[in-house]
């Protein structure tokens, strides 16, 4: 039986290798491995062997069957590939093959950063408020404690459309509109205001005539500076790491009093001083402060009863710092070599 198995294996492998088409190969499968084939006959004869020979010959027979099965599968794959190639040569289009999948975009880096901040604030009970990008001069300046003759207006050149309308230079007008219509019987104001803003800046590595801002506003009874500091601490740790510390420096903004700028401990050097933090150990992130009483009163809010805080930051700056982007223009030029480095996995691949 040993010689019979060896002869069968050699003969079958030779014929399998020489098979020129799938029909011939299938005939060989039936011939050698079918119910009436030699392998089946050999397996039936196992019962006639002695108890000592049966395990050895049974194992050998199984090895031969496995070898022939694998040889047939391998040859089948070769013949199928050859058949497809031959068919492709004779047809302009093979409609049975899968088509080329379209490229699917992912969320832009800025969108990812904005949504990360939105998710954080929504988790803290904030709502998202929006307003027009073509804004009235009143809401962009006067309602924010910047009357027409205020010297602080020179701090930001604006794109005026008419004498009283312009492209908003900040998302703060959304805060003014929100305060005007808010009903405090339904609770305090807790909103963030993301959106595009426009300023007459010359485009360079750190400036753009159009960019995005996210501003936050909380107004209610007994809102204190401690509430502002706690909120900014959560923001810094969420966006830049739990180990971040914050530093608040006195500053000036017409719509807040007192006003502060927030720095975070450098995430690159841990506060030791490096190129990113310019050797100081700290990186400036945003401006903030307690809402000026004049701003509250202009919105019809009793400043003796209600207080609040506001803050504002640029997602571009957050993205540039967090992901080591050295030129703001990379965020807007739509160069796939750049954007592919920050692919989101939510919607597929670029």
Curated annotation (Swiss-Prot):
Q: Fetch the Pfam families from UniProt.
A: Phe_tRNA-synt_N, tRNA-synt_2d
Keyword Transit peptide listed: no
The residues that the entry says bind Mg(2+) are 257
Question: Where would you find this protein in the cell?
Answer: Cytoplasm
Keyword Metal-binding listed = yes
Q: Which UniProt keywords apply?
A: Aminoacyl-tRNA synthetase, ATP-binding, Cytoplasm, Ligase, Magnesium, Metal-binding, Nucleotide-binding, Protein biosynthesis
Group of enzyme by EC: ligase
* Cofactor annotation comment: Binds 2 magnesium ions per tetramer.
Q: Give the chief site where it resides.
A: cytoplasm
Give the UniProt entry's GO cellular component terms: cytoplasm
Which InterPro entries does the UniProt entry name for this protein?
aa-tRNA-synth_II, aa-tRNA-synth_II/BPL/LPL, Phe-tRNA-synth_IIc_asu, Phe-tRNA_ligase_II_N, Phe_tRNA_ligase_alpha1_bac, Phenylalanyl-tRNA_Synthase, tRNA-bd_arm
What are its cofactors? Mg(2+)
Tell me which EC number(s) this protein carries: 6.1.1.20
Q: Which GO terms describe its biological process?
A: phenylalanyl-tRNA aminoacylation
Q: One MF term in GO for this entry? A: tRNA binding
Q: Which reaction does it catalyse?
A: tRNA(Phe) + L-phenylalanine + ATP = L-phenylalanyl-tRNA(Phe) + AMP + diphosphate + H(+)
Q: Which PANTHER family match?
A: PHENYLALANINE--TRNA LIGASE, MITOCHONDRIAL, PHENYLALANYL-TRNA SYNTHETASE
Q: How does it assemble?
A: Tetramer of two alpha and two beta subunits.
* Family of the protein in this entry: Belongs to the class-II aminoacyl-tRNA synthetase family. Phe-tRNA synthetase alpha subunit type 1 subfamily.
Protein name stated in the entry: Phenylalanine--tRNA ligase alpha subunit
| Species of the source | Listeria innocua serovar 6a (strain ATCC BAA-680 / CLIP 11262)
> Which lineage is the organism of this entry classified under, starting from the top rank?
Bacteria, Bacillati, Bacillota, Bacilli, Bacillales
* Gene that encodes it: pheS
């Amino acid at each position: 039986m040993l010689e019979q198995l060896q002869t069968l294996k050699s003969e079958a492998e030779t014929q399998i290798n020489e098979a020129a088409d799938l029909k011939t190969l299938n005939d060989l499968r039936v011939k050698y491995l079918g119910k009436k084939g030699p392998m089946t006959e050999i397996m039936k004869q196992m019962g006639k062997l002695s108890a000592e020979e049966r395990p050895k010959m049974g194992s050998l027979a199984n090895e031969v069957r496995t070898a022939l099965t694998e040889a047939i599968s391998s040859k089948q794959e070769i013949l199928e590939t050859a058949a497809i190639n031959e068919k492709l040569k004779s047809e302009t289009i093979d409609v049975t093959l899968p088509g080329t999948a379209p490229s699917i975009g992912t969320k832009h880096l800025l969108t990812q950063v904005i949504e990360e901040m939105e998710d954080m604030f929504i988790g803290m009970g904030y709502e998202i408020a929006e307003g027009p990008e073509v804004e009235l001069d009143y809401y962009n300046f006067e309602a924010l404690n910047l009357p027409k003759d205020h010297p602080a207006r020179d701090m930001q050149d604006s794109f005026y459309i008419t004498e009283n309308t312009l492209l908003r230079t900040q998302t703060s007008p959304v805060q003014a509109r929100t305060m005007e219509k808010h009903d405090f019987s339904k609770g305090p104001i807790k909103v963030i205001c993301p959106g595009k803003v426009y300023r007459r800046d010359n485009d360079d590595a750190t400036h753009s005539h159009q960019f995005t801002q996210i501003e936050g506003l909380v107004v209610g009874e007994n809102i204190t500076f401690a509430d502002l500091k706690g909120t900014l601490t959560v923001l810094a740790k969420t966006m830049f790491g739990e180990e971040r510390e914050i530093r608040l420096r006195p500053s000036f903004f017409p719509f807040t009093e007192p006003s502060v700028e927030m720095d975070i401990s450098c995430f690159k050097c841990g506060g030791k001083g490096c190129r990113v933090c310019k050797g100081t150990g700290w990186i400036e992130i945003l401006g903030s402060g307690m809402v000026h009483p004049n701003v509250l009163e202009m919105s019809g809010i009793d400043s003796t009863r209600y207080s609040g805080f506001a803050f504002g930051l640029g997602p571009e700056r957050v993205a540039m710092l967090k992901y080591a982007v050295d030129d703001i223009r990379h965020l807007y030029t739509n160069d796939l070599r750049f954007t592919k480095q920050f692919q989101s996995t939510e919607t597929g691949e670029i």
